[in-house]
Structures are given as C-alpha cells and as structure tokens.
C-alpha cells in the first residue's frame, strides 16, 4: 500500500506537469481534460484502491476467547493481463496498479496511442518503490501480444477497458482455452456505452445546452461516458435547439497547446474517417 500512496504523491506533485503534458501532446487532450484525468483521477484511483484493499483485509472472522481466526488473501496463481485504452491515462495506472497492489504479477499492454503517458506511469511506480518485474509493460502488435498471453498456462486473469467487441473476443478465446490454464481465470472488463441525457420540461435550456455540449464534445466525444443521445420534451425543443446551434458555432478547435481551444484532434486517422462517414450519412 505504501508504494501506491507514494505513487499518488508523486503524480500530485513532481510528475503532475509531465504526465499532463504527455496526455495533452500524445492523446490530444485539452489542459482541463488532462488535469482531471492524468493527475486528479489517477491520484484518486491510487488512493481509493489502497482504501479498498484495507477495507477488504479488515473484514475478518470473529475470534472467541483463546482463539485467533485470521483470513488471508493470496494473489492469483499466475499473472494478470491488463489491457488499457488510449482515452484515460488514469485507467492506465489503475488497471495494472490495482492488480499489483493485491500481490499479482502483471503483464500490461497499453494502447499504441497512449505509450508516452504510459511510460511516465511506469516511471512513477518505479520511483515509488515498485520492484522490477511486478508490472511489465509490453508494446507491439496487440493481436500477437494477446494471443501469446492467452495461450500461456500461467494466465490467471484479465483486467480490461476497451470496446465491447474486443472484450467479447477475449472472453471467447479464454473460454476456448480453459482446459489449458492452471486455474480458472478472473475476467474483469469495462466496455463501451451509449450514454443519454433526459431533460424535463422544466429544464433551463441554457444549462441544458451547456450540459449537452460538454457531455457530447469534451475530448471529442472519445469516452464511454460521452452523451450519445438526448431526449428533449417537445415543449422546450425549439428553444433548446436554437441555443444549442448557437453555442456549437462558438466552439474553438485546434491544438491542445492553445488553452483557449475546447476541442482538439481525434486520436487517429481511422477515427476521423469514421466520423466523416457518419456525418455524410446524416446529411
């Protein structure tokens, strides 16, 4: 626990500017989005995980007079495979870190588009005192790495954040290989969402338009929590859409190095092409 509390101190202090800058430059987040993710949320994850671990260990069976009952926890019998996405630097510290905190050896595959800040996360853990070989970052072809990992008899668990389709494929392959493993792997995953906003007819349309714009377009909508649907009562729809269109026209877009920009670039060319196709279909 002390190692990860120290890591939280390092992220909040001497590494704060570096991890924010890496998230801005390599993942194209604005300064605000980088700060609430790479610094604030990562610190929260690290501290909350320590709190949760202490809570788990505190849940002990009763000990009567002359008897001391003690419940201990062992790591999994093998290694944990952590797979993290590009869109949250905090998740890249949380998924491998929480598994390591409970005594597991971790093979960690960061997103190809998040390698810069992932390297800084590793540097933080190392400076905090994490021994070499506990969290092992592996870069390269995702399919090759995953197939190698899931074919190992020592694979004992997966900690995943990413798309629903990829997670289903991983689950299916693990099931196919179940006879080859030394134990039953733990499968933990967080996947995509289709979040929505529901407005009441008493809603303030100024506040509502702001909420929709921020929910849909912050970090270019590249979050599972991004607002993808909005349900508006007919009684306020005209006023709302007029204000929404007016505010959307004011959005500034450009480099994250300009702190006045609200939006920046999407993560890669394929993402851009997908959005262009969706817009063309909508027309």
Which residue ranges define each predicted feature?
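Conserved small-residue-rich beta-alpha loop and adjacent elements
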Residues: 58-132, 206
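Hydrophobic/aromatic ligand-binding patch that stacks against planar heteroaromatic rings
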Residues: 98-100, 149, 179
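Conserved residues at the C-terminal ends of beta-strands
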Residues: 52, 83, 141, 161
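ALDH superfamily catalytic-core signature
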Residues: 124-129, 151-153, 157, 164-283
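Long amphipathic alpha-helix in the N-terminal Rossmann-like dinucleotide-binding domain
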Residues: 1-17, 24-57, 67-71
């Amino acid at each position: 626990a002390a190692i990860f509390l120290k890591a939280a101190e390092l992220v909040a202090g001497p590494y704060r500017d570096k991890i924010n800058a890496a998230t801005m430059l390599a993942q194209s987040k604005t300064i605000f989005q980088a700060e609430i993710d790479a610094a604030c949320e990562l610190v929260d994850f690290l501290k909350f995980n320590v709190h949760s671990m202490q809570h788990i260990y505190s849940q002990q069976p009763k000990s009567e007079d002359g008897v001391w009952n003690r419940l201990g926890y062992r790591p999994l019998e093998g290694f944990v495979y952590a797979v993290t996405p590009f869109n949250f630097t905090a998740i890249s510290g949380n998924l491998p870190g929480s598994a390591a905190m409970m005594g597991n050896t971790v093979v960690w595959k960061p997103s190809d588009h998040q390698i810069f800040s992932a390297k800084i996360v590793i540097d933080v853990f190392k400076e905090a005192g994490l021994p070499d070989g506990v969290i092992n970052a592996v870069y390269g072809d995702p399919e090759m790495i995953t197939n190698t990992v899931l074919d190992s008899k020592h694979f004992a668990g997966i900690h995943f954040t990413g798309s629903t389709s990829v997670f289903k494929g991983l689950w299916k392959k693990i099931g196919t290989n179940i006879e080859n493993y030394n134990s039953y792997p733990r499968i933990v995953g967080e996947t995509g969402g289709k979040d929505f906003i529901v407005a009441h007819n008493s809603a303030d349309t100024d506040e509502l338009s702001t909420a929709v714009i921020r929910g849909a377009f912050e970090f270019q909508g590249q979050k599972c929590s991004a607002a993808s649907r909005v349900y508006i009562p007919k009684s306020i729809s005209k006023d709302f859409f007029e204000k929404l269109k007016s505010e959307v026209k004011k959005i500034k877009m450009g480099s994250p190095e300009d702190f006045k920009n609200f939006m920046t670039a999407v993560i890669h060319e394929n993402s851009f092409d997908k959005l262009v196709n969706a817009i063309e279909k909508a027309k």
